[in-house]
Amino acid sequence: MSQPTFYEILSLSPTTSDLTPASIKQAYRRALLTHHPDKSSSNFSSSTSNSHSNSHPKGHHPPKTRYTIDQISLAYTTLSSPTLRTQYDAALRSSSSSSSSCFTTTRKEEDDDFQTGIDTIDLDDMVFVPHETSSSAGISRNEKDTWYRPCRCGNERGFALTEEDLEENADLGEVLVQCADCTIWLRVCYVVAEDDEEEEEEKEENGDGDGYEEEKRKR
């Protein structure tokens, strides 16, 4: 049985010339939720769960072929990189699907310029730098809380995430980030704590209501 291509994994057409980083990222997110629907239901609030239920309407059947998270992540990191995608497309054109499988399984044997390995860590494994410290240090992304991790290419802050990055991918509970200096990617997993804002708002509303009733009694 031939191995699926990265395009098949993300349900993208290799002949589409107008694939953008945004459309590839959207396909990646869609693939994760399609093949691993638990990604959107295990960690998040009811509002996110509602959006997930809308993306999987009643009567929806799971895919016949289920891809692993590693397959989906590797497909995304390869196709979202112009250099790697060009090399991958060349491999698809010049060989059979079995050769594209070789591309997938032997990528670690290629030179460093073609490395697409993906390490998986928890957010707690990254160094947290509050925005106040970042601002005083003059870091470019200085107005946001930032998480850093060194890359094995030598860059001490090769991987960088902001709170905005985490919020953007909150429905997945993970985010893929590429090293600033090489093609190595990192998958960072995290759990989104349930927001207590609604409860606080309810308490405030109840408090306002009690105050209103008390004011009426005084009158």
Swiss-Prot record:
The protein's name: Diphthamide biosynthesis protein 4
Q: How does the entry describe the domains?
A: The DPH-type metal-binding (MB) domain can bind either zinc or iron ions.
What are the recorded GO MF terms, alphabetically?
metal ion binding
Q: CDD domains from the xrefs?
A: DnaJ
Organism equals Neurospora crassa (strain ATCC 24698 / 74-OR23-1A / CBS 708.71 / DSM 1257 / FGSC 987)
Alphabetically ordered keywords of this record: Cytoplasm, Iron, Metal-binding, Nucleus, Zinc
The record's annotation in InterPro entries points to: DnaJ_domain, DPH3/4-like, DPH_MB_dom, DPH_MB_sf, J_dom_sf
User: Which residues hold Zn(2+)?
Assistant: C151, C153, C179, C182
Is the Transport keyword given for this protein? Answer: no
